[in-house]
């Protein structure tokens, strides 16, 4: 039995009658699965059957940092997962640790957190487990993958470390350098240096109290950093803050802080330079950047594209390239026109590399 979300218990007190308009449960056709990593975590995956019938490889979607799988499946009008399913692809979302995850609890009856996980565990444990699970359940020898933000960076680490089982992949708003200027570049290394790597960064609680701000205050911090209101509505961002945000591990933030200071993302033991390893990647990868993305500026995303061995393609989402408005960070997966301007580009790439 799944435990009730603390969020669903406190939202009514915070938002009164408006809670019902924010929280949209998963639809009945969503199948919830769990896959156990070698180091003992149970990851949550959600499956949507292809409609009307499968016409291509299964697709696995992965969220960004301090997020969960609902980022790729927020509601009926903003769901990359349901969109791909409606276009003939059996589609899965995965929530990386600790989002929707349990450690050491068979059956998921009692969550127990395991401290100290970082980027390496996402690359070596979580993504291989999710890919293997989807391949096993579907019987597909290869699957396609799309990752937003951190979900794309983890994909880079997976492919650079020799990860197998992917036919084609897309990364959306995924920086491979964090030393090129950005709103948190100076702050995160200072904060991360003060905190214990076994702690968790509490993103979920503060996001609840930011919900009214996102709807009432123009040019608020989330608007300035995370999205362009010409693409993504305040209501959509309020929903994201209500049930799409999760705490994250400080060890992960410390590795990313090192990336901000040195320009290189390395494994904790220093043996792997993840960006340098991209030169040996042969899986086709589409790299998508948002023209107005302040979390993952265009040069930072372009660094990943340049490092890839290929085959590869680059796509910039902005007015100068035919979009109605310049895309911010979350717009790529939650924007009002993402289903007509962004996701078809990803699907077309997958289809061209499945022949």
Residue ranges and their predicted role:
Residues 7-17:
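Bacterial N-terminal signal peptides
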Residues 21-50:
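N-terminal cap/lid segment of alpha/beta-hydrolase-fold proteins
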Residues 50-100, 105-108:
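Short, surface-exposed "cap/lid" segments of acyl-processing enzymes
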Residues 114-136:
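Alpha/beta-hydrolase active-site loop
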Residues 136-141, 146, 150-264:
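Alpha/beta-hydrolase-fold enzymes
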Residues 281, 287-289, 293:
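Short beta-strand/loop motif that positions the catalytic acidic residue
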Residues 313-355:
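Catalytic active-site module of serine/aspartate enzymes centered on a nucleophile-bearing elbow/loop
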């Amino acid at each position: 039995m799944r435990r009730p979300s603390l969020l669903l218990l406190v939202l009514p007190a915070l938002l009164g009658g408006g809670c019902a308009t924010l929280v949209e449960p998963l639809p009945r056709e969503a199948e919830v699965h769990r896959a156990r990593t070698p180091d003992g975590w149970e990851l949550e995956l959600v499956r949507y059957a292809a409609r009307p019938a499968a016409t291509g490889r299964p697709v696995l979607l992965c969220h960004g940092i301090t997020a969960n799988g609902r980022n790729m499946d927020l509601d009926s009008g903003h769901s990359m997962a349901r969109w791909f399913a409606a276009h003939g692809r059996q589609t899965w979302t995965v929530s990386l640790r600790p989002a929707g995850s349990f450690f050491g609890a068979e059956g998921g009856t009692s969550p127990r957190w395991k401290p100290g996980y970082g980027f390496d565990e996402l690359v070596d444990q979580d993504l291989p487990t999710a890919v293997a699970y989807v391949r096993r359940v579907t019987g597909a020898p290869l699957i396609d993958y799309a990752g937003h933000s951190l979900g794309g960076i983890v994909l880079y680490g997976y492919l650079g470390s020799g990860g197998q089982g992917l036919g084609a992949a897309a990364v959306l708003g995924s920086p491979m350098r964090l030393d090129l200027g950005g709103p948190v570049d100076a702050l995160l290394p200072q904060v991360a240096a003060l905190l214990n790597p076994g702690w968790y960064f509490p993103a979920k609680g503060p996001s609840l109290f930011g919900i009214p701000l996102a709807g009432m205050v123009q040019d608020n911090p989330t608007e300035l950093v995370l999205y362009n209101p010409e693409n993504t509505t305040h209501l959509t961002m309020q929903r994201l803050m209500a049930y799409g945000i999760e705490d994250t591990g400080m060890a992960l933030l410390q590795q990313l802080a090192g990336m901000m200071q040195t320009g290189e993302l390395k494994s904790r033991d220093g043996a792997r330079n993840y960006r340098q390893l991209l030169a040996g990647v042969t899986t086709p990868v589409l790299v998508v950047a948002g023209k107005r993305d302040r979390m993952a500026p265009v040069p930072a995303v372009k660094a990943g594209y340049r490092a890839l061995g290929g085959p590869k393609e680059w796509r910039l989402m902005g007015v100068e390239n035919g979009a109605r408005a310049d895309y911010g960070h979350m717009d790529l997966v939650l924007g009002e026109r993402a289903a007509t301007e962004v996701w078809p580009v990803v699907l077309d790439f997958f289809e061209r590399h499945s022949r």
